[in-house]
Regions:
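A short, hydrophobic beta-strand element within the central beta-sheet of small alpha/beta folds
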Residues: 79-86, 90-103
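Short, electropositive alpha-helical surface patch
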Residues: 105-126
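Short, flexible/disordered intra-domain loops and linkers
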Residues: 62-76
Length: 154
């Protein structure tokens, strides 16, 4: 079972993600873990380390709506995943957004940015590689790299 951490400032979107994962059918079970962004990037990174997910999926604009959180979030989803990848290089991270052009422009890796509408099956259509299939694949590739590195060091 893989633990997938989803970070968003909207409670409804966190619930939508849980439902999205529940509807996903695969031989590999996924455990969705949802979290609001914290008001400090360093604290958020510490929180992620404690959760120990197998992948991180974050909304891009974490400070856009203030209905469910009452504090300022001074970073976006790209900032968050890039900061985490400084600690764990090549860790499976993804950013979901309605503003994919903006997120792509601010990201060092355009391949981590996906349109948020996939949570509502509006964008995946007949794609053979669905979003969560890609997440699982990235986790497996990451784990295989770690294992190869361990064998090289042994």
């Amino acid at each position: 079972m893989y633990k997938i951490l989803f970070i968003d400032e909207e409670k409804d979107t966190l619930q939508d993600f849980e439902e999205f994962v529940e509807k996903f059918h695969s031989k590999i079970k996924l455990e969705p873990i949802t979290n609001f962004p914290l008001s400090n990037l360093e604290e958020m990174i510490e929180c992620i380390i404690k959760i120990a997910p197998d992948a991180i999926i974050s909304d891009y604009r974490l400070n856009e709506l203030k209905t469910d959180i009452k504090y300022n979030v001074p970073y976006n989803g790209v900032d968050l995943v890039e900061e985490y990848q400084r600690i764990r290089n090549d860790f499976p991270c993804f950013v979901l957004t309605a503003l994919d052009d903006e997120a792509v422009n601010s990201s060092n890796d355009v391949n981590i940015v996906y349109v948020k509408n996939i949570l509502y099956n509006q964008e995946e259509g007949n794609a053979k590689a669905k979003f969560l299939d890609r997440v699982i694949s990235q986790i497996e590739h990451y784990e295989n790299r770690i294992e190869r590195y361990k064998q090289e060091l042994a």
